[in-house]
Design a protein with these regions (language model features):
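Catalytic cores of alpha/beta
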Residues: 71-101, 183-220
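Structural preference for beta-strand elements that scaffold enzyme active sites
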Residues: 5-9, 46-48, 77-81, 99-102, ...
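Glycine-rich, proline-tolerant flexible connector loops at the mouths of alpha/beta enzymes
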Residues: 46-65, 105, 168-179
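Conserved, mostly hydrophobic/aromatic
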Residues: 11, 39, 47, 93, ...
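Short, acidic/polar
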Residues: 27-40, 86-92, 146-158, 205-208
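C-terminal helical cap(s) of enzyme catalytic domains, especially alpha/beta-barrels
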Residues: 113-121, 208-252
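Charged helix-capping and loop-helix junction motifs
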Residues: 28-29, 60-67, 145-153, 179-187, ...
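Conserved anion-binding
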Residues: 12-25, 98-175
């Protein structure tokens, strides 16, 4: 049986790691490479670097941040998101040390580019990001750049699912609020035939366990809450105590 994964999420704005609250408020945490090094040391199964200010200003990927991280020599697989507009950006990101990429704005602007990217990098290297909220009349997908929501169907019509390996569903309105991930968002799996990653407001072992026991959910991301205490990754994994979760890793001091 494939083990479920715990993804450590590092949010970057203006080159600095930040705590993000509902895509509206941000508090500084420090240098991204320091957080990444900690997550690698504590045994995260993957690390996601999401640079949230790149696509909004047409800046392209943050290769400077990626370059600093690549020099760390970490063993944990790295996912990068932010400013990827097409094949050229995607190739640069991978050449600067990312193992996989996650795209968001590209789905809205040029979904046809996904095929080109996937043919170059391989479908397994491509993740699509879906910021969701449960509205009064159903699931709403958010274009975070202008904060405009569309019915989920509009987003799905744009996305060529055959060119992505996984989808990350983010509860953007509850991001940064402890234990607040809206599990109703998982109804999206009824419309999709893809493995799901979950993120946004996931902080407690009990909810993490519920989310990960969903058969289509293969991983969950935790962001702000891993910065509050040392060895937070090992603590969460130990509390879960599930054979379905990869075992906690403790770095040797010898």
């Amino acid at each position: 049986m494939l083990k479920k994964r715990l993804i450590g999420v590092v949010t970057v704005k203006n080159g600095w790691a930040v705590q993000s609250f509902g895509y509206r408020r941000y508090l500084p945490l420090g240098r991204p490479e320091v957080l990444v090094q900690n997550l690698d040391r504590w045994g995260a199964d993957e690390i996601l670097i999401q640079c949230i200010d790149r696509s909004s200003f047409g800046l392209g990927p943050d290769l400077e941040v990626l370059g600093k991280i690549s020099k760390l020599g970490i063993a944990t697989p790295l996912i990068y998101a932010g400013g990827i507009g097409g094949r050229e950006d995607a190739v640069k990101v991978v050449s600067h040390g990312a193992d996989r990429i996650m795209v968001d704005a590209m789905v809205w602007d040029s979904p046809q580019s996904l095929e080109t990217v996937a043919r170059d990098l391989g479908t397994q290297a491509v993740i699509a990001h879906l910021p969701l909220r449960m509205g009064e009349d159903g699931l709403k997908a958010l274009d975070y750049r202008d904060r405009v929501e569309q019915p989920l169907g509009s987003w799905l019509e744009r996305l060529p699912l055959e060119w992505v390996s996984e989808l990350m569903v983010t509860d953007w309105s509850h991001e940064g609020s402890p234990g607040s991930f809206d599990e109703r968002l998982l109804t999206v799996v009824q419309l999709l035939d893809k493995p799901i990653l979950c993120f946004g407001g996931i902080s407690e072992a009990a909810q993490l366990h519920r989310v990960l026991t969903h058969p289509t959910v293969v991983a969950a991301g935790v962001g702000n809450f891993l910065s509050y205490q040392e060895h937070a990754v090992q603590t969460l994994k130990k509390l879960l105590g599930s054979s379905a979760m990869r075992a906690p890793h403790y770095e040797s001091t010898l």
